[in-house]
Amino acid sequence: MKKQSLFFVPGIILIGVSLRTPFTVLPIILGDISQGLGVEVSSLGVLTSLPLLMFTLFSLFSTRLAQKIGLEHLFTYSLFFLTIGSLIRLINLPLLYLGTLMVGASIAVINVLLPSLIQANQPKKIGFLTTLYVTSMGIATALASYLAVPITQASSWKGLIILLTLLCLATFLVWLPNHRYNHRLAPQTKQKSKTKVMHNKQVWAVIVFAGFQSLLFYTAMTWLPT
């Protein structure tokens, strides 16, 4: 195990906090965004689907990127990309769409590689650190959903996006000291391991369960607020 920064655990916690909040609050304030931009709410509905599309696309080659760039370096670039994507959503409607795509792509890469990052840095604390970031993600998502409307009413939808961008920026800055402690993923054996996984019933059970869990979560986040 290589040396690691003292900011690794705080970085993991803040990554958990930033892993859902930049886009899960959007359905709650779609009405305010439509009024602010002078467009129909229906034209903004795709904002809730764009991150999920990015999840699908960028999950496919996140591992290859980590093998070439390294985990810590890739997380640094992804968090920077996440912050910029969140920021440009404030400018106009086209950049709102582009920024949402950037947010989704960044989170997709982080989401896929976070377990590998923990394993590379703290192989003896995988369970603890996984619980830590999942818990921080759940609490942050709940708080963001609860506070989104009061914050928007007290300022505007842009005020809420600014706060979320500052959260992303704080995560990036706290993570930055970890950039120098870079781990590269080892190349995986292709054909045999893939065949075994695809014929494993337990793997398919987990895939189906996770798929339905995500379906219920994102459906609720999209439709219940409105």
Predicted regions and their residues:
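Cytoplasmic helix-loop-helix junction between adjacent transmembrane helices
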Residues: 101-135
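Extracytoplasmic
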Residues: 7-41, 59-62, 220-225
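Short hydrophobic/alpha-helical segments at membrane-entry points of transmembrane helices
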Residues: 94-100, 206
